[in-house]
Regions:
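Active-site substrate-recognition loop segments, prototypically the cytochrome P450 B′-helix/B-C loop
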Residues: 2-19, 23-167, 176-194, 198-200, ...
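Short, conserved phosphate/pyrophosphate- and ester-handling motifs at nucleotide-, phospho-/glycolipid
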Residues: 75, 260, 328, 376
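Cytochrome P450
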Residues: 181-188, 271-285, 338-344, 389, ...
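Cytochrome P450 heme-thiolate "Cys pocket" and heme-binding signature region
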Residues: 346-413, 422
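Conserved cytochrome P450 K-helix E-x-x-R motif and the immediately C-terminal K′/meander segment
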Residues: 286-323
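Cytochrome P450 catalytic-core helices
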Residues: 250-255, 261-286, 370-387
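A translation/RNA-centric and nucleic-acid-associated enzymatic feature enriched
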Residues: 308, 321-322, 327-343
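Cytochrome P450 catalytic core segment centered on helix I
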Residues: 183, 192-247
Length: 422
């Protein structure tokens, strides 16, 4: 078809040329990697997981630190697939870490160590067997009594004041002392180990210094226990048929402290946050209609103490459900994101549900979950019995959370209660 003026004898160009045709609309920009290290993420991670899911689905591009890309897994089914497949998703980070400068703030937390968490195959079996044997020999009746004794001492120290920070005054010193006793660690060495672990979990530049402190302290502990063995986890590791050398021993201790201090402290405090802010549930616990164990399971499901932690490094690009995972780039399981996958139902109704990933799954599942449960449950039960009128000393919205890509950790937990002179 001709344009209307095509047959005219004379045609003049328009006074103003027509604009060129509009280009086809560009596709919306792909959302940038989500930074897990910022305070905004720590303040409201569940909203962040919801945005990630809406933008990306179950596999999300993230940054663990500025310029450190990774894939965060927030789909429950996808996480189980990865955790159970050691061949396509090994835990050994050595190829990746060669591409990361020593100044990288998350490198100390993620780098290779000769332990069960960062190994596979025969070496993983060897390390895990030694650790499992040493942990399984813990007498849980004696452990319960130990937790109660240390709880009593901690509460006696702050009870006359009528106020306390349950993180600084209760959960942290209790967990530290219990673990040090189980490992046969002298206080002078244990305090250095705890300082190093705290710095390591916080990430940032301070993590590098924390790694140095930690490595020297655990080396000193191994030397002490080789010379003076006792009935403790460290001595049992030394005596195990795996015949761990000093370097391997040091890394087993680092692993045990890493899995024993920060996660258990966070489990205790996160559970206390729920009991102090959920009046109805707290009332049920005090009345005996709900148990501390149910509160622990709710927190492990909703706000696990290590929110994003299990790492895998595919040796080749992997297509998982239509998502291409790059070779030798971290794949991080978000226990918090996976537990709150809408495919599992409403997480608010998760009380008593133990199908969560807080303890991981597959060959790298936590070997000390029974002991961790016992420590947290015994400590919280003793505290609630000792201070039944305890209340939060601030508005719930004023509680703040420590930033960091790996943990779900309260910064402070202030409470008040009637003063009682000793």
């Amino acid at each position: 078809m001709k344009p209307p003026h095509a047959d005219a004898e004379t045609s003049f160009p328009p006074l103003f040329p027509s604009p060129p045709p509009s280009p086809s609309p560009l596709p919306p920009p792909f959302p940038p990697p989500f930074p897990l290290y910022e305070e905004e993420f720590a303040a409201d991670p569940h909203s962040a997981y919801a945005r990630m899911r809406a933008d990306h689905g179950p596999l999300v591009p993230v940054e663990l630190a500025p310029g450190v890309p990774a894939t965060l897994v927030i789909g429950y089914a996808e996480a189980l697939h990865i955790l159970r497949d050691e061949y396509r998703f090994p835990a050994d980070p050595r190829v990746w870490q060669r591409t990361v400068p020593d100044s990288c703030p998350v490198k100390p937390m993620m780098e290779w160590r000769p332990n069960a968490i960062r190994s596979q195959g025969a070496e993983h079996t060897r390390y895990r067997a030694a650790n499992t044997a040493a942990i399984d020999a813990v007498d849980e009746h004696k452990l319960h009594d130990l937790v109660e004794r240390i709880s009593h001492r901690a509460i006696a120290g702050f009870r006359p004041a009528g106020q306390a920070d349950l993180l600084v005054d209760f959960a942290w010193p209790l967990t530290f002392q219990v673990l040090s006793d189980l490992l046969g660690c002298p206080d002078s060495i244990g305090h250095r180990i705890a300082d190093g672990m705290n710095k390591l979990f916080d990430g940032g530049e301070i993590a590098i210094r924390g790694n140095v402190i930690l490595n020297q302290a655990v080396a000193d502990l191994v030397a002490v226990k080789r010379n003076r063995p006792g009935y403790d986890i460290t001595s049992r590791l030394i005596a195990h048929s795996a015949r761990l050398d000093d370097t391997e021993m040091s890394h087993q201790i680092v692993t045990l402290y890493g899995a024993g201090i920060e996660p258990v402290v966070n489990l205790i405090t996160n559970t206390l946050v729920r009991l102090l802010t959920d009046v109805e549930f707290s009332g049920d616990v005090h009345a005996g209609d709900a148990s501390v164990r149910e509160a622990l399971d709710f927190v492990l499901y909703r706000d696990p103490p290590l929110a994003n932690f299990c790492f895998a490094y595919p040796p080749h690009p992997v297509n998982l459900g239509g998502y291409l995972l790059p070779a030798h780039q971290p794949v991080v399981i978000s226990m918090a994101g996976c537990n709150n996958d809408p495919a599992l139902g409403d997480p608010q109704n998760a009380s008593g549900n133990r199908a969560h990933l807080a303890w991981s799954a597959g060959p790298h599942a936590c070997p000390a979950r029974s002991q961790a449960y016992l420590i947290a449950e015994s400590a919280i039960t003793y505290l609630l019995d000792a201070l039944p009128e305890m209340e939060l000393a601030c508005a719930p919205q004023d509680l703040t959370w420590r930033p960091g890509p790996f943990h779900r950790a309260i910064a402070h937990l202030p409470v008040v209660f009637p003063r009682v002179d000793q």
